[in-house]
Amino acid sequence: MAIAKDAKDWTLDEQEAVAKDIAKNGTSSIAYAKAKAAMDAGTKFSMKLTNGKTLEYRIIGINHDDLADGSGMAGLTFEATNSALGSQRMNATDTNAGGWDKSELRTRLNSGDLWLLLPSELQSKVKPVTKTTDNVGGNGGGAPSATTDKVFLLSATEVYGDMQSDGIQYECYKSKGVTRSNYSG
């Protein structure tokens, strides 16, 4: 695999190839340095959704999430950086009662109307991962369990890192020293 161009110019096919190579070869991947530099710089990618809006996204993790099929790690994890999907509620009661596992938003993001906003070219490249999530919700304390997701919300721990909850802080946030006491959005 030869990735000569800057990460900001990677096509979806190249993003997928980079993710696969990093998953296979880790830091020895020929694309690792470019992916890490893109993550550290906050390089944004974009694509048109099926509703005509533009989704912007960036790399937040490298070899961070376990693939749900047990075959290894997802080479790259991405995060949306704009509100192309609009403001969404977790469930009909507009709370997190029931947690992520039972949420209306999880269904909508992984197989419903929000998933269908992603172009088929992207849908075919997204690999399900296993996430550790607090499925009690309602701010009632941690009871982490596993869910399988293609698209997911980040847990507080995945962003802040200094909480005893679900998941592990993503490298993008950790490298910037983000904690719950200093995060400004």
Predicted features along the sequence, with ranges:
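Collagenous Gly-X-Y triple-helix signature in extracellular proteins
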Residues: M1-G185
